[in-house]
């Protein structure tokens, strides 16, 4: 199984990066091949998610807030790639409402 974590380093608390690596290690223990990619500018999350879907990755996890989630959703539209959310943003309204 192949997956990607799209991480917004400007979202949420500074210690989220450490937690992100812990999540990644747990996924790897369960047989996932994971890459972590960071966003730098607006639109990166959508582009990175679309690239993962086009590459045939099984899942994309969003590590960020509502804006990052929205971009990844847009990048995965019409794909068969599963999306997961690691809510590390400030508000995380999307994750709370789910």
Q: Where in the sequence are the language-model features?
A:
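Small-residue-rich beta-alpha loop regions that form the catalytic core of phosphotransfer
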Residues: 2-98
């Amino acid at each position: 199984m192949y997956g990607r974590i799209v991480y917004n380093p400007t979202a949420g608390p500074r210690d989220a990066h450490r937690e992100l690596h812990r999540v990644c290690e747990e996924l790897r223990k369960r047989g996932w091949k994971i890459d972590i990619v960071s966003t730098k500018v607006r639109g990166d999350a959508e582009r990175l998610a679309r690239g993962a879907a086009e590459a045939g990755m099984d899942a994309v996890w969003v590590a960020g807030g509502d804006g990052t989630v929205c971009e990844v959703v847009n990048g995965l539209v019409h794909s068969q790639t599963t999306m997961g959310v690691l809510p590390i943003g400030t508000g995380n309204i999307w994750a709370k409402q789910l």
